[in-house]
Each structure stands twice: as C-alpha cells, then as structure tokens.
Swiss-Prot record:
<keyword id="KW-0520">NAD</keyword>
<keyword id="KW-0830">Ubiquinone</keyword>
<feature type="transmembrane region" description="Helical">
    <location>
        <begin position="25"/>
        <end position="45"/>
    </location>
</feature>
<keyword id="KW-1133">Transmembrane helix</keyword>
<protein>
    <recommendedName>
        <fullName>NADH-ubiquinone oxidoreductase chain 6</fullName>
        <ecNumber>7.1.1.2</ecNumber>
    </recommendedName>
</protein>
<keyword id="KW-0496">Mitochondrion</keyword>
<feature type="transmembrane region" description="Helical">
    <location>
        <begin position="46"/>
        <end position="66"/>
    </location>
</feature>
<dbReference type="GO" id="GO:0031966">
    <property type="term" value="C:mitochondrial membrane"/>
</dbReference>
<feature type="transmembrane region" description="Helical">
    <location>
        <begin position="1"/>
        <end position="21"/>
    </location>
</feature>
<dbReference type="GO" id="GO:0008137">
    <property type="term" value="F:NADH dehydrogenase (ubiquinone) activity"/>
</dbReference>
<keyword id="KW-1278">Translocase</keyword>
<feature type="transmembrane region" description="Helical">
    <location>
        <begin position="75"/>
        <end position="95"/>
    </location>
</feature>
<comment type="similarity">
    <text>Belongs to the complex I subunit 6 family.</text>
</comment>
<feature type="transmembrane region" description="Helical">
    <location>
        <begin position="108"/>
        <end position="128"/>
    </location>
</feature>
<keyword id="KW-0472">Membrane</keyword>
<keyword id="KW-0679">Respiratory chain</keyword>
<keyword id="KW-0813">Transport</keyword>
Amino acid sequence: MIKLFFVLAIFSSIISYMNIDPMKSSFFLIFSLLFSMPIISMSMHIWFSYFICLLFLSGIFVILVYFSSLSKINVVKSYMSLFLLLISIIYFSPVSMEYTNYLGLSGFYYSIYWFIFSFILICLLFFMNFSSYFLNFSGALRKV
C-alpha cells in the first residue's frame, strides 16, 4: 500500500510538471503532497508530517498568489517526463528501516527523513523550474 501511495505521489508530481496551467499544476502538486503524507506519517514522529504539510501548502499558496494573474504562457513540449517518472520511482522508492538505529537526534534529522526531504525538494524544484521556464513574467510578479 505504501508503494501505491508513493507511485501516485510521483505520478502526480510529474503531471504537475507537465501541466501548463499554474492552477492545475498547483492542484497536482498538492495531490503529490497528500499522497506522500501516509509515507511520512508511518515513521516515528507523526507530528512531523503535519509540519511538512503546513510548510508545503503555505509555499504552494504563496506561489499561486504570485502566478495567478498570468497574462502569457509559453507552450514547450517536454519529452523527459516518462524518463523522470521512471528515475524518481527507482531512486526514491521507500524501503523498510530499523528504527532502533535512528533513535538519536542526528538520526531524526538526517537518516530517517533523507529521502522524504529530497523528494519534497525535487517536487518543489520541478514546480519552480516549470514556473520559470514556461512563464514570460509579464504579469506574474509585482511591478516595482
């Protein structure tokens, strides 16, 4: 079941990267977060999944506020989507860990959540790459 949630999270993040409309892209990025939450909450600290969810959603809504008034979007076809999907499923697939080795504070920050941190960082980088690559910034940001 965890693998299913993981594959759905990766799939929705790739669809978020492929989608041209920023509103739909943010919607699929939120789906990616929701599908990755069961994986995060299966670990030792359940409160940490809520913390990640709040930070991620606040970032997504800030991005939506700035990019909702778009006036022009460039359409560019990307053929790397299937390759990115395959590589992310292979590289970031969840594995079972022994929690007795990770009871220290350094294990909490580095060892257990390394793949989760990197997965969320990759999703946000995909979304920011999408935003900076497809937009002309004619009405995206505030004028100075």
